[in-house]
Structures are given as C-alpha cells and as structure tokens.
C-alpha cells in the first residue's frame, strides 16, 4: 500500500511545503520526501501503536541534514517532530486522497 501526504515542516527558515510518499510492507516503510526541490529517501517502521518512526535526510541548497522523524497518524492527518543534530522541526500533514493523486497525474 502506498500513501501520499501534503506536509508542512516548520523549519528554522520558516514553513516548508512538500509531499511525503510512504509505501508499507508489513511494518517496514520506504518512500520519499519531496521538499524544496529535492527528493529525499525515507525508510522506517510502523510501530504497533500506529506511530511512524522515519529516518531520512533533508537536503537543502547548502547542506544535507540527517533526521529522525516521529509522526502520529490519525484519520489521515500526520503530526510530529523531526530531530537532527542542529534542530527540531514540527510536522503537519494530510493524506492526499487517491482520486486527487490520479487527477494530478493526468
């Protein structure tokens, strides 16, 4: 199963909009984070309580920041925090419904 979320990450430079794509294989997660013109590889696990534990870089024009992100998923809404050596960033996101994904592909 693959899902896409429209996400907003509250970075030190202000809010950043992007798309988080997640593919589930049991409790294992792979995917990508398309943010500020860069596509970052995502991997992680889905915990028994429904929490997503993701590991990924966030690439910018000046650096690549390794992050650990913990997200709570409730009724198609994501909320959580990314932690890196230099910062903590709050996340919010909403599920992009399959019908909207199909229309945008046309």
Where are these regions (language model features)?
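Central antiparallel beta-sheet cores of small beta-barrel/beta-sandwich binding domains
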Residues: 1-75, 79-106
């Amino acid at each position: 199963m693959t899902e896409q979320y429209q996400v907003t990450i509250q970075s030190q430079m202000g809010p950043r909009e992007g798309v988080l794509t997640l593919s589930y294989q049991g409790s294992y997660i792979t995917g990508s984070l398309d943010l500020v013109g860069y596509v970052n590889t995502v991997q992680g696990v889905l915990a028994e309580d429904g929490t997503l534990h993701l590991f990924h870089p966030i690439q910018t024009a000046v650096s690549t920041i390794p992050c650990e992100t913990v997200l709570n998923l409730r009724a198609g809404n994501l909320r959580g925090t990314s932690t890196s050596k230099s910062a903590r960033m709050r996340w919010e996101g909403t599920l992009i419904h399959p019908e909207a994904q199909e229309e945008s592909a046309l």
